[in-house]
Each structure stands twice: as C-alpha cells, then as structure tokens.
A protein has these predicted regions:
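N-terminal anchoring/stem segment of glycosyltransferases
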Residues: 1-56, 234-240
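A structural signal for well-ordered alpha-helical segments within the folded catalytic domains
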Residues: 18-21, 25, 69, 163-171
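Hydrophobic anchor at the start of a short beta-strand
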Residues: 34, 79, 179-181
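A conserved donor-nucleotide-binding helix/loop in the catalytic core
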Residues: 55-80
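The conserved acidic donor/metal-binding loop of glycosyltransferases
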Residues: 83-87
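Conserved donor-nucleotide/metal-binding helix-loop-beta segment in metal-dependent transferases, i.e.
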Residues: 88-121
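A recurrent flexible, glycine/aromatic-enriched loop bordering the glycosyltransferase active site
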Residues: 111-126, 154-161
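Catalytic core and acceptor-binding pocket of nucleotide-sugar-dependent glycosyltransferases
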Residues: 130-240
Length: 240
C-alpha cells in the first residue's frame, strides 16, 4: 500500500483554516497529495480545495464528519484522513509502515489512542473503493444525505457530539469487520515508531520543546497559526 491523498477539512474558522498552506506543503513533501474539504460559505478557488457546504448542518460538524466520506470520491486512490492542525514529519512513519500491506486492507494507525467506543481520526487509510464498501456512499449527493442523517438535533461545538466522527467510525468499522474478517490492519505505536511533538508540551524555550535526537512522526501544532507561526515554521524547516 502507498498513500496517494490525505483528506483534510476546515470551515472558515481561522484557528484551523490558517494551517492549510503549511500543512498541505508538509504532506506534499512526504509524497502525498493534500485535499481540503472546505465547509465555509465563502468558496475557495484552488484545485486542491473541494467546497462542500450544507445549509442545514453546522459547518464545524460537516468539517469533522465529511472526512469519513470524502475518500469515496477517489475510488482508485489510497486516502488517509487527518486533522488540519497536525503536521506530518516522517515519510517513514506514514508510508513506510504500510509498504508491505496489501491494497485491500483498511489501516488503523493508532487503534489504542482513544477509549474503546471510538477510533481516532488520526489516522486511518484505505483505497477509496474500500471507504465506499464501509460507508456505502459514492457521490456528493449520497455523502450529503449521509451527513444529514448523522446530524444530531441539538448539535453544539464542543458539546456531547464533539466526538461524533470518531464514534461513527468505530461503529462502521466494527460492523464491516464482522462481515469481512481479516480486512482491517491495526498498527502499534511502539513498533510503528509513533513519536509526537505535542503542543501540550509547549515551551517558549525551543530547546526544551524540541528534542533534536528524536525522530518525530508528527507535530500537533498550537493554535492559532498566526500566533505561533515562528515556532511552527521553525519545526517545518528543521524537517523539510
């Protein structure tokens, strides 16, 4: 297996959207084409940006959940889904770990990253046709209908529905795996070499924050980019 595309998403919230330029460049630097599903109202003209908005749904809800369905629009490409405020730092981690996995598998990079009722959005990868088999959608119209059917009556940002996407992913993967034994490959953090540069450890002293002796897999960046751009750019330049 080899990753072709990464699916990212954001609405018009600058805390997230500002990451698109640098994060898209990082993904390109490890050989993966970035695709942004933009759910804001003001359309963005860019060949790698897919404008997707539903008036009946909150744009944040769409941004979170459309990532599960967006890969179905690329049936012949192997797609990984990720957060827009996460920067990949290691081609070996993302590509090297799956090079010996067959194209008919669905790969869960971090199966133990959340509680048992969820699967972490970061990261999951499969051919677009596999995503079609799992979620039973294959067009913009069917994706829209699926999202509307998922939309909670009392949705609120940061509320009980905030992890809806990860719970839905768990539900659909469990259902699919029950009928398709040996169709899911789960990686292990230790053997895969997962090593995150995490914003939770942020320090104004770069030497305390960034360990040059570590081989980082990714950078969970502090928000917003406009405030922390010097730090983020420095990490980017050290790795690319």
């Amino acid at each position: 297996m080899k990753l072709d595309k990464v699916i990212l998403s954001s609405d018009d919230n600058p805390d997230y959207l500002e990451f698109w330029p640098i994060v898209s460049e990082a993904w390109r630097n490890i050989g993966i084409e970035p695709i942004l599903f933009y759910t804001g109202k003001n359309k963005i003209k860019n060949e790698n940006v897919f404008n997707f908005n539903l008036e009946k749904c909150d744009s944040a809800f769409i941004a979170q959940n459309v990532r599960l369905l967006a890969p179905t629009l690329f049936p012949n490409d192997t797609c990984i889904i990720s957060d827009i405020d996460n920067m990949p730092l290691s081609e070996d981690y993302f590509q090297g770990n799956i090079v010996n996995i067959t194209d008919n598998q669905f790969v869960i990079y971090r199966p133990d990253a959340t509680s048992e009722d969820m699967i972490s959005i970061m990261w999951n990868a499969a051919k677009g046709s596999k995503w079609i088999d799992i979620f039973e959608v294959d067009s913009v119209e069917s994706i829209s209908k699926k999202l509307l059917s998922w939309y909670p009556e009392n949705y609120s940002i940061g509320g009980d529905n905030w992890y809806h996407d990860q719970k839905i992913l768990k539900e659909f993967i469990t259902r699919y795996e029950a009928k398709n034994i040996s169709s899911i490959t789960r990686l292990n953090d230790e053997s895969a070499g997962f090593c995150r540069l995490n914003r939770s450890n942020y320090s104004i002293f770069f030497k305390k924050f960034y360990d040059h002796n570590k081989k980082y897999s990714d950078f969970h960046m502090p928000r917003p980019y406009s405030k922390y751009h010097k730090l983020i750019n420095k990490v980017f330049n050290l790795n690319f």
